[in-house]
């Protein structure tokens, strides 16, 4: 019998209680009454949408700031709080959770596109247990059903209040945290090694694009036409991928474009640039590009734009966003076609070494993540206590 099984037999042999969120805590809103200027001249830190979306444990060492007046009634984020994203382009990406698992040393706030849950009694859950539990399959299925919408989905707090989660005894929580944190530690080690390799790749890529005045520079609008995406909900299921800002969302029976294209984010994940060389559809949170391949290799544009910090071209605060007019003004080098081909061939090889999930470090990380998810969902499935 494992240590966890022994603890379950000792502390909850008849199962565990499941409680609705409304009985466990109180929801609170993120920042209110803020405009663009408040985010451009900040005096206090805030937790961004992407911070919540991307991290099981909330990152507090952030550079995002907002101006908050001395007497303003804004909700501060505290240790043990659970933060949720309030909207996304698909129900599956709504209500993503992030838990404050370390002490908060200074006032820090939550962006207006997210909301928080503060427990009435913080002694009944370990924050590190909640970070795993709320990302587990059983709870995520419930959270996804709280979203309403057509082209963009918003979380319903009344529905969120009815979501139920297990409440195992603390010794059981501690053992589950120990096991799952060990898995995450192994993943982190591999990710750190991959980060180091990617830094080498990025440095070499930077050197390849260090043209200076030796080549002609053009605006992005001079080498491609940026086009909007649109809704796909009325289409049937098919073989053509539908791209959102985070990548492939689903597959449909028609396509918007069938030539090589670089997909650029309009909202959401601004670091997600995609290269597509097969027919595809894209939603309105992503732009696609039409490129004259007799003058410019689409993959060359893709590799170069990976060196551009698109966040600098974004609106400030809230959900990150880009416009056609801003993207059109990005300067891009335009060497001869043979030189473009040479650079693309080199960078494709490096990209495969760093990102190919069928081999190397990326494959190891993908395998570890699947292993973690398997054990997480297995360990977090409890027998319900009768009554």
Q: What annotation goes with each model-predicted range?
A:
Residues 55, 59, 177, 200-205, ...:
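A cross-family "folded-core" feature that marks the main globular domain of proteins
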Residues 3, 158, 199-205, 325-326:
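Short, conserved phosphate-binding/catalytic loop or strand-edge motifs used
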Residues 25-164, 221-332:
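DNA target-recognition domains and sequence-specific DNA-contacting regions of bacterial/archaeal
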Residues 17, 32, 50, 151, ...:
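Structural preference for solvent-exposed beta-strand-turn elements
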Residues 1, 11-19, 130, 161-199, ...:
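Amphipathic alpha-helical segments
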Residues 8-31, 210-242, 364, 375:
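Non-catalytic DNA-recognition/assembly elements of restriction-modification systems
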Residues 1-11, 378, 387:
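Accessory (non-catalytic) regions of SAM-dependent nucleic-acid methyltransferases
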Residues 103-107, 194-210, 351, 361-380:
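Short amphipathic alpha-helical linker/capping segments at the junctions of internal repeats
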């Amino acid at each position: 019998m494992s240590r966890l099984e022994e603890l379950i037999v000792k502390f909850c042999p008849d199962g565990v209680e499941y409680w609705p969120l409304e009985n466990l805590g109180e929801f609170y809103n993120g920042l209110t009454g803020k405009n663009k200027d408040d985010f451009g001249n900040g005096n206090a830190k805030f937790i961004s949408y992407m911070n919540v979306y991307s991290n099981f444990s909330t990152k507090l060492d952030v550079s995002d700031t907002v101006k908050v007046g001395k007497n303003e009634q804004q909700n501060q984020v505290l240790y043990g709080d659970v933060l949720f994203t309030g909207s996304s382009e698909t129900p599956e990406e709504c209500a993503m959770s992030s838990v404050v698992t370390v002490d908060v040393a200074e006032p820090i706030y939550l962006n207006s596109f997210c909301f928080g849950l503060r427990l009435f009694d913080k002694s009944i859950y370990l924050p590190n247990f909640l970070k795993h539990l709320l990302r587990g399959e059983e709870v995520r299925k419930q959270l996804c059903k709280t979203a309403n919408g057509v082209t963009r989905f918003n979380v319903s707090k009344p529905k969120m209040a009815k979501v139920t989660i297990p409440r195992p005894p603390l010794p059981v929580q501690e053992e589950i945290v120990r096991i799952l944190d060990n898995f995450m530690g192994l993943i982190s080690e591999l990710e750190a090694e991959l980060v180091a390799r990617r830094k080498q790749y990025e440095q070499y890529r930077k050197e390849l694009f260090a043209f200076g005045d030796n080549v002609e520079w053009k605006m992005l609008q001079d080498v491609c036409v940026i086009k909007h995406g649109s809704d796909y909900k009325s289409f049937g299921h098919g073989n053509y991928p539908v791209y959102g800002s985070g990548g492939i969302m689903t597959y449909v029976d028609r396509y918007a474009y069938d030539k090589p294209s670089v997909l650029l984010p309009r909202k959401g994940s601004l670091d997600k640039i995609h290269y597509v060389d097969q027919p595809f559809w894209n939603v309105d949170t992503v732009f696609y590009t039409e490129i004259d391949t007799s003058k410019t290799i689409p993959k060359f544009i893709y590799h170069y734009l990976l060196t551009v910090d698109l966040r600098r071209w974004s609106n400030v605060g809230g959900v990150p966003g880009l416009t056609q007019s801003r993207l059109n003004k990005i300067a891009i080098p335009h060497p001869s076609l043979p030189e473009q081909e040479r650079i693309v061939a080199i960078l494709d090889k490096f990209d495969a070494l760093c990102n190919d999930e069928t081999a190397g470090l990326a494959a190891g990380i993908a395998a570890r993540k699947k292993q973690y998810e398997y054990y997480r969902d297995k360990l977090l499935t409890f027998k319900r206590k009768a009554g």
